[in-house]
Regions:
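Beta->alpha turn/N-cap motifs
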Residues: 91-96, 156, 186, 203-208, ...
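Bacterial N-terminal signal peptides that target proteins for export
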Residues: 1-12
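An extracytoplasmic/periplasmic, membrane-proximal ligand-sensing/linker region
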Residues: 30-32, 172-176, 261-322
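N-terminal (or domain-start) structured segment
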Residues: 25-112, 151, 159, 175-202, ...
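Hinge/capping helix and adjacent helix->loop/strand transition within the periplasmic-binding protein
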Residues: 81-87, 101-188, 237-239, 248-283
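N-terminal signal peptide c-region/cleavage motif recognized by signal peptidases
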Residues: 20-22
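A ligand-binding cleft/hinge motif common to bilobed small-molecule-binding domains
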Residues: 96-105, 171-173, 200-234
Length: 322
């Protein structure tokens, strides 16, 4: 008499697969998740990762550990080369998009190496001048620059930084001849602006807000396309004579390419819910960012459109990263 239970017929085997498949998908996650952040420890990207990680730990029931990796290439490359199993994630900074456009030796492809999960938040820059500089509006700044071609200079946190690219776009759209003075980081560039050693600069919100409040700098405009809740008293550059001008840093969460859609969707659902919590929104807002919380598809489209936009600007200007 044949033994029962030792041989699975094709029909029974199919049923087993149907039952086991969803159960395996529902098991994620079964171990701690590494959340790699780009940039300096304590910087904006690292701060965002540390806001999200404890909430994601509670939501998923597994510890989410923030792994800050110094530099711009190493963190992204680490995630790109990790197993696509949902246990290694990336909190990206703006350099994820910009750096491959300015260097030829970047080991990852922004579109092909990652699976977008959600666009978490966006940060604009603020156009600021020294209080003694005569321009009190964007149009006045442009008029002065046009009247003195090649004489005005602007600072940035470094070649290829978001503050540099914001100014480069401004230069192109305003059709002005101005001189770029790159510094090593925001602190040095802001010190130069406060010392009236450069005439204007596009600054990150967190760094410029207290300086404007104390009267050490004067803000002229914000670089969002529409009025920003972060700076309700400031006009946009777009509404101040340069229609269509926009510069916002795109920051989100990504996984290695090939990560199963079920895992991407789980992470998207949980992270978007986290981003809608008032305390999280307030924390981002106070740090100079506005929460987004997009679908994976929306984030993917944003990445591609940003690459196309800035790729042309960087190529035409011949910008090479430091």
């Amino acid at each position: 008499m044949p033994s029962c239970g030792r041989v699975l017929t094709p029909a029974i085997f199919s049923v087993v697969l149907l039952v086991a498949g969803p159960a395996q998908g529902q098991a994620y996650p079964t171990k701690p998740i590494r959340f790699v952040s780009m940039g300096l420890a304590g910087g904006g990207t690292d701060y965002a990762a540390r806001l999200i990680a404890p909430e994601l730990t509670r939501a998923l029931g597994q510890t989410v550990v923030v792994d800050n990796r110094a530099g711009e290439v190493v963190p992204a490359d680490t995630v790109a080369k990790s197993a696509p199993d949902g246990y290694t994630l990336l909190m990206n900074g703006s350099s994820l998009l910009f750096l491959p456009l300015m260097r030829t030796n970047v080991p990852y492809d922004v579109v092909k190496s990652f699976a977008p999960i959600t666009l978490a938040h966006q940060s604009p820059t603020v156009l600021a001048v020294h209080p003694q500089f005569p321009a009190k509006s964007v149009s006045e700044l442009i008029a002065i620059a046009r009247a003195k071609p090649g004489e005005l200079d602007f600072g940035s946190a470094g070649t290829g930084s978001s503050t540099h690219l914001a100014a480069q776009l401004f230069k192109i759209m305003a059709n002005i001849n101005v001189v770029h003075v790159p510094f090593k980081g925001s602190s040095a560039s802001l010190t130069a602006l406060m010392g009236n050693h450069v005439k204007y600069m596009f600054c990150t919100p967190g760094s410029v807000t207290p300086l404007v409040a104390s009267g050490r700098l004067r803000a002229l405009a914000v670089t969002t396309l529409k009025p920003s809740a972060l700076f309700p008293a400031l006009p946009t550059v777009a509404a101040s004579g340069l229609p269509g001008y926009e510069m916002v840093s795109t920051n989100g969460v990504l996984a290695p390419a090939g990560t199963p859609a079920a895992i991407i969707n789980t992470l998207n659902r949980e992270i978007v819910q986290i981003l809608q919590k008032k305390q999280i929104r307030d924390a981002f807002f106070n740090a100079g960012s506005e929460v987004i919380g997009s679908s994976p598809e929306e984030f993917s489209r944003t990445i591609k459109s940003e690459l196309a936009k800035w790729g042309k600007i960087i190529k035409d200007a011949g910008i090479k990263a430091d």
